[in-house]
């Protein structure tokens, strides 16, 4: 973080979507103005097998996020870096056994309450 700050980067956008990050089921659907857009349809993945990591619970993700925030936010404060957590995309309960926790306003309030700091924020995407 210190090196990022030295070169003028003052915000780090990160996500809490292990294994399967941004997921899409279609990458070329027609959109407005003849644009091609990505989409996600839960029906297309709901019966797919779990990943090789099996089931990852919300409890585990919250424990890991709490550990991360308590370790990293103080360093961000020292470095003058702002952390911005990206919402889960798509905002579904789980994908192939991997839970999603950053899907609601209440979840972001909980995240902010774990380590209240102006350096602990969210990405508006």
What are these regions (language model features)?
Residues 2-67:
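Active-site-proximal, glycine-rich beta->alpha crossover segments in alpha/beta enzymes
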Residues 49-125:
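Acidic/histidine-rich catalytic cores of soluble enzymes
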């Amino acid at each position: 973080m210190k090196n990022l700050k030295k070169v003028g980067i003052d915000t780090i956008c990160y996500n809490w979507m292990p294994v399967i990050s941004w997921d899409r089921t279609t990458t070329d659907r027609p959109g407005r103005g003849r644009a091609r857009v990505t989409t996600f349809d839960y029906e297309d993945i709901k019966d797919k097998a779990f990943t090789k990591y099996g089931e990852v619970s919300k409890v585990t993700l919250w424990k890991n996020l709490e550990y991360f925030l308590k370790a990293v936010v103080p360093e961000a404060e020292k470095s003058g870096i702002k952390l911005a957590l990206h919402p889960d995309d798509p905002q579904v309960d789980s994908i192939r056994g991997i839970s999603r926790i950053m899907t609601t306003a209440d979840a972001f309030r909980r995240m902010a309450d774990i380590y209240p700091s102006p350096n602990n924020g969210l990405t508006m995407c």
